Structure formats: structure tokens, C-alpha cells
Amino acid sequence: MDQRRTCPWALRSDGDGRSASLLCLLLASLSWSASSSTSFSTFHSEHRDWTFNHLTVHQSTGAVYVGAINRVYKLSGNLTILVAHKTGPEEDNKSCYPPLIVQPCSEVLTLTNNVNKLLIIDYSENRLLACGSLYQGVCKLLRLDDLFILVEPSHKKEHYLSSVNKTGTMYGVIVRSEGEDGKLFIGTAVDGKQDYFPTLSSRKLPRDPESSAMLDYELHSDFVSSLIKIPSDTLALISHFDIFYIYGFASGNFVYFLTVQPETPEGVSNSASDLFYTSRIVRLCKDDPKFHSYVSLPFGCVRGDTEYRLLQAAYLSKPGDVLAKSLNITAQEDVLFAIFSKGQKQYHQPPDDSALCVFPIRAVNAQIKDRLQSCYQGEGNLELNWLLGKDVQCTKAPVPIDDNFCGLDINQPLGGSVPVDGVTLFTSSRDRMTSVASYIYNGYSVVFVGTKNGKVKKIRADGPPHGGIQYEMVTVFKDGSPVLRDMAFSIDHKFLYVMSERQVSRVPVESCEQYTTCAECLSSGDPHCGWCTLHHTCSPRDSCERADEPHRFADSIGQCMSIMVQPSSISVSQHSLPLSLLVSDAPDLAAGVTCLFGNLTEVEGQVVGSRVVCVSPAARDVPAIPVDQDWFGVVLQLKSQETGRTFVSTEFKFYNCSAHQLCLSCVNSAFRCHWCKYRNLCTHDPTTCSFQEGRINISEDCPQLFPTEEILIPVGEVKPITLKARNLPQPQSGQRGYECVLNIQGVIHRVPALRFNSSSVQCQNSSYLYDGMDISNLAVDFAVVWNGNFVIDNPEDVKVHLYKCAAQRESCGLCLKADPKFECGWCSGEGRCTLRPHCSPQPWLDWSSRNVKCSNPRISETAEGCKALPGAFPQQSCSWAVSAAAKSDTAVRRE
């Protein structure tokens, strides 16, 4: 059976002709992992220990290439697996040099994983360069289509890049001039094997994969070579010294590498934990095989008093119009986005406090040019101790230094101590930022930042003074795995490929659909998002039909459509009324509009310019107003007959004036309600009032009681109650007069009342009772009515207070402590608290009397700790300690 028919995507596993059947079974079991969640397509590692290392996307085909431990994968754009190429494990030993694939090795061999350390697409030759950690770091050139091995150069020492088996320490840049063989600039950590591996080199990359010159140094002689090695003296000084290559790129005539390395000051500690690290930007001319153009400067950024110097990741991009303007550069220039952690220690376990910074390449080059000019003027030293081993004085030479200066055989290699400081855009004190990628959308620089906890921050880089604005954060890896350094966009820039050690996810660059209103959409800060008006959706412009027509696509919040209805509410008794809807910022509605009143009814709208006329619901469709409410709201929507989608809405209210039983609540309602004074009725139609003078629509004209002095009525006393009022109506023919209604302990008492004029009414003489002697003062709900049940408003809640002098005042002292407003006194002869008229000609005491002294005072309690003296009267021996409560009970008043 043809293996490729049953497993067509398992094209090739390795170059030794072994059967692909095992690989086919492996891939069949793996294919389920390229699954899709709610938002993301994902691809998972086939073995827990075979973690992912590198990722790149072909900018023409959209194929995704993933370098992992023991595998290189080719995936489709939606992360389904196409090819898996085996790179390990193999029998090896790091001490075998040359590796055993060249000559036998006496060291003990073990099955060793192959860590992918470099994955670069060589576009012009349609091949993939994949370099690993096996066999001292040999590389393979793989055909892009099927990952077939084109060549695996391994027979010369130039073919061994580095045996370091830690990913993220090597970076390569391919430079190719049209019609010529390419060059591979490569920087790598060497793990102390400086004799075997250069830390930086440029190598030949012939078009012919079988060329014997493949990966040879561009220039190599006894005196000059296209390489830099770490001196043994530096390793003797700092045994842990190495240079980690984080990122690299070509821009203009130069190649740049971004590195992190230990500092090498005199007297430095040899402990790895005590090392200070410096992030540096290294520049070489593309056409400088002698490396005379080597310049290395420290770089980082600062916010406030905090320095960010530990490089985590970087990405070369364009600034876009907005960021370019703030940086005073053009939108076509290159800028470098970089992530730094705080400080300069613990590079391998960096602090969570991190920063996103931007460096215009123009500014980097300008600072390098200044450094070159000062050195060629003989100022200072070369400042590259790790490489030169000592301070070397700059040599003065009358050499013009222009923007493309590539060095001479003097004043090289050149270092520096003054850092290139970038512009800090965004900082985060938690969840350290670990990766960065950027692209331009609609003039904005949109930056995507991965974090230690598996999230991606979306940041709009506006530049000074606003910096970077985080407008969204997406959880990509639910297990909280860190986002690795490599991120890449799909060729249409609609997706971002994000990688952790065990998962690759395809994340949409925008999630505009999450915003359901125009205001939410256009205040989100996401430059991708605009409001597609007639589709009533938040989307990118290119997803909105006819977006270029006026008002079809809103990209600022001031362009959101709004609707104003006249009238904005109607009474439940009004039916089929024409409503005028003014729609602002509306597109052409000539295709037709439908009016929807909630789920009540749907009617055709008449479009007249920028207005739409809708007819309100018929009587059968008018909603019922809930009890205890005077209105009910429905959503009035306009639906486009072109798109079938509602595109603008507002609340429309149906109100019921008759829900109001009092004049003040009627005229103070939110609606056009009127009070018919002589009908005691609230209505939306004032013409229904009996008399013109009976129509009220302002609170000042409502009949209402005014507060007066407190109304105090002793129980059993026959007294009138006189009240102040305003606008009291004169009962008309056939209408009954006024009454006062008191609710005394649940019993309604109606008392005839006399209206003196429009501002005064009096409840006629009457007496009132309430039950119980445990209540001395009872506030009674009170109302003035006329014509039986027409209630006069009582906005200040005027009450009648009934009281009993004797209630809870059994002693003389308690009686005399009663509030003077009640006019209670102690009737000594009868031994009770009462009003004076009810006390027979006996001594009657109240607080206004002179020399008041209750007879036979009693001490009911004494202060704690008071002790009567033996043989003494208590009131004499402890009168000074009588408690406040006892004084109240006895009410002793002494001269």
C-alpha cells in the first residue's frame, strides 16, 4: 500500500530512508490536538518533554513552522499538521568533538534530545534552516514544501554552531543581495567552549545546498575572520560569562543583534547569582566580513526612578502615523519594540516588573555615530573589556564618519557605557511581559505582548505623552504557561500565533464582536474596531459592507447614531399616533425602515429625509401599566429593510396619569399630566376637566396643607383643629363639604370641617380617645378630605398628636418632667398627673410653680458603690449619689 495515500501529509521523517509508517501513526494520533476552542485553533506537543522552541510563518504561503525538541513541524494556517520532521533523539555526548557523525567517539553515548535553537526561512531558495543542539549544534536545510533534507553539513568545524542545549540563546539573520549567495549572521551562547564556537559570526549561505562552502565563515584567515570569540581570559575572570542572543534583524545597511551578558568590571564576583547583566545592541555592516564595523552599546529604558535593563524580547516593526508623529520620525522608518525587566540582576529568573519600550532605529544609529565620532577624535577608550581584556585608548584619526561608516582596522571593536534609552510606552508590575509583536492598522501601531501567566496584552502604542494604552487582555493558555518569545502574524494579519512550551494557539488580532453597542465599540480603544451602522455590529472596516459610503461605518464615538422621538412618550389612552423620529448620523435609508415597539407591534416606517415617521401601537397592542407604576417602557427600534437588522433604538414610554391619586404627584410626574381639581382626577387631557379654572399643571396651584404649630390634643378634651392651607377648592353644586379623617389605632374617625377660605380649614369641636396607659403621646395619621373622598395634599405630613398626662407618669416627679408643651401638672389631692382644669381646688404643681417640692420623695435606686451610714436616713446619707433615673422618678427640687 502506498504510505502517502493513507497518510498523505507524512511526507518525510528523516533523511536515512526509514519507513514513514511509524510517523504516520504518530501523526494520526496527534492530529486531534489541532483543535479549535471557542476562539482559538490550537496545536499541542505530541510528547510532554518535547517542548516547543521556535515559531515562524511563511509570509507568502501562510504555512506555520514550529521548531521543537526532536521535531520540526509544518502546520497549515489553522494549525492542522501537514508534516512532522524528526530531528531526535539520537545517541550523542556533548564531549564528542568532532561529533560522532564525523568520527568515532570514546565517550559514553546516551539517547539525547535535540533542542531546536534556530529556525529561519530562506525565502529566495525556498528552504528552512533548522539548527539544533545535537552533534555540537549542526544545522539542516529543509525543503519548505515537505521538510525533505536538502543538506546537513557536519564535516567541518564551521558547521558546529554551539552545543548549548538551552533555547533562546541563539539568533540568526539571513542577508541576501539579489543574484548573489546569501550570508548568515549568527550569534550564540557558547557555554564556556570558546575554543570551539565563536559567539558571533557571518557565514556563507550558497544557493546550491550541496556547495562545499555551505556555512563556511565569510572570511577566515590567520589574521582576520568573520567571527568574534569570547577570550579565555574573560572566562577565567568570570567562569559563568556568556552572551545570550535574544533577537536580531537587518535594517538599512546594517545587521543588529540584541544581547544580554554579564558585566565585567574589575573585582567582579565569580558567582552567577551575584552577576550584574547588561543588555546591549550590537551593530555590524552587512558588507563587512572583517567585522571592523562592530559596535556594541548598552540599551534599556527608564520610567520615573525605575530602570529596566534586562532584555526579554524584541520585535522590529514600523511605527504607523500616530506613533511616528509622536517620535518625530516618518511612518516608513524602522522602530524596535523591546520588553525589559526591572534592574540588572537575576537574568535567568527576572523580576515581574517589566516595561514595553520603543527605539527608533534612526535614534540608535545616531547614538552609534556619536560614539564613533568621539572615538575617532581620540576621546576615551574602546570600552569593550570582555573582548579586549583591558582599556584600549581610542586612536585619533581624521576620518569622516557618515551614516554608513563601516569602520577601519583601528578603533575596533568598539563598545560604550552610555546607554541607548528608548521611550517607555507601558509598564506592568505583575505578570512579567515575555514576548512582543507589532503591526500597523489604520495608522496605529498595535502591539501584542505575551506574559508569564499565559496572557496576551493588546496595546495601542500612541507614544508620548500617552504612551501605550492597553485596551484588551486575552487569556491564551488556561494553564498559565508562559508565552514564549516567538510570536508571528498570519499573512493577512487577522491572527497572531502565540506559543507556550506545549501549545501553539491562533489568536484573533481583534475581538470587535464582543462590543454590542456603538459607544462600547468606539470607546474600547481598539483601533481595529468601528461601528457598522446598518448591520449594528462592531467590526473592522473591511468586514463592513459598503463601509466607504457616508455614515455606513463609524470610527469615532461622535459618529454613533442617535435617535430623538417626538413625542417621547404617550398616554395609554392614545392610539395610532404618528411619531417623528429624528435619526442623527444615519446613512441612506432609502431601502426602507421598519419600526418595532418592543415585542408589541411592528409597523412600516416612512422615511422623510433624516426623519422617520412611525405610527404608535393600536389600542389592542398598548401595554398594560404594572400596578403601582405610572409608566411602562418599551424599546423602540428601527430595522433596516436592506440588512434585516435593527440599527438604532431608544426607550419609548407609555404612561398612565390616572395612577396618581393626589394633585402633587400628578403634576410632578415625569409626564404631561394635569389635575382636574373639581373631579379629583389626573389626566393627560386637560380638556376633560369640568371647569377651566379647575385645571392644574403646576405644584403651586395644588390644594395642600401647610405645616403649623404642633397640633396637641389631650385625650377626652373637646377641641377644634385649625389648619393652614393653600388653594382649597370651594365645593360646587352637588358636592359635599370638608371633613377631617383621623386614623387612631386603626379606627377611622371622620369629623366635619369648615372651610373658612382657600387658605384655612378647621376640624370642628370633637374629642378623641386611644387605648392604653403605656403610650403618653400618640402621633395620628391625619387627612383633610372633601366631597367624601377627595384628599387634600399633605406634603409635610402634618399629624395630630393625642396625649394623656397620666400615662407613664404615676409619680409627682415623672409628672413634672413631662414636656411643658403638654401643660401637665401634679394634682396633689388626687395623686395623679392631669391638666389643671381637671384638678379640684387642691395644690397643683407644675414646673412653672415657685418652690416646687414633691412630697414624700422616694429613692428607687442609688449610684453603684453608695452605702448608707448605719442609723441614717437613706435620703440624707446618700442623696448626693441618687442616680439620674432616681432623680427622674422622685423629681426632688431643692432650693
Segments from the language model and where they lie:
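Cleavable N-terminal signal peptides of Sec/SRP-targeted secreted and luminal proteins
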Residues: W9-S33, V634-L636
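Beta-propeller fold recognition
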Residues: L82-K86, E90-S106, I121-N126, G132-H240, ...
